[in-house]
Amino acid sequence: MLSACCICASAQEQRTEVMIETTAGNIRIALHNETPAHRDNFVKLVNEQFYDSLLFHRVIKNFMIQGGDPDSKKAEPGITLGEGTLGYKLPAEITFPLHYHKRGAVAMAREGDETNPDFKSDACQFYIVWGKRFSTMDMERLTQRLDSASNGKMTFTPEQIKTYRKIGGSPHLDGAYTVFGEVIEGMEVVEEIQRTDTDDYDRPIDDVRIIRARVITRK
């Protein structure tokens, strides 16, 4: 009976995994079941080979790497990217505090608050968090800010504060963007990409390209 229960629990926890093969190395991500619309949309695009040959077109050191702009596939050097999309948006699936912007988190990009007050996600552009480590004082300030922005509905847990202090991330994004996955292998590749030299618009001088993305497992 115990074994059967364990097997059932394991099956419920199984997550879809995607391998992103890049010119800098491979990044393996697991998609959260708690964000089903984002998970299914991402898997659909991967299976359609949408991400193959696209660039990580926006890279900011100690912050994140962003890819998925369809205009980046054949973009000439020096062209500013980031406006390409698929013409639809995804309803927000913000599951904070369960999933948050720790180092390695995978989240969907979106338009700004003024034009997008419901925090709807872009259909295809995603980012992987690198971030930085924060001091206790930093986290106290960010906690006050989050509390104010959410009218007291959100706050950082002790575990999150510890993670941001010891491992790092981008806590200022919490509660405002949908985190739909996390890197489970290849953070050294993310680290290398986020260190790359960029132009004035955060595009890498030397293109970092997604060779292909493929689904590894499916629930």
Q: Which positions does each model-derived feature cover?
A:
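Cyclophilin-like peptidyl-prolyl cis-trans isomerases
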Residues: 9-219
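Bacterial N-terminal signal peptides
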Residues: 1-6
